[in-house]
Amino acid sequence: MSITIWHNPKCGTSRNVLALIRASGVEPAIVEYLITPPDADALARVAAAVGGAAALLRINGTPASEMGLIGADDATILAAMAVNPMLINRPVVLAPKGTILARPAERALALL
């Protein structure tokens, strides 16, 4: 089974999801998205899978509000995420069974 996690090692939820995946016997591909940001196409695919760019937008601890992204259209949000990956909520899990924003962490269990 091929699983990828968009991961931030400083995030407790992201670490918990990574541990859940590993506990299932799978070693996922780990993308530290703050170091290696996803391209615009990957962002668009994930946003579509999780319910739109607004669902993927991280608000707490980011300049999303100051940037006018609350209530903005998908194209505007995705363009901002492409330039500023701290705006991407995490962890995102991509698996053969689907793609989810794993908040809370237990949501990842449905993909394992």
Question: For the regions a protein language model found, what residue spans apply to each?
Answer:
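Thiol/selenol-based redox catalytic cores and closely related redox-interacting motifs
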Residues: Y33-L112
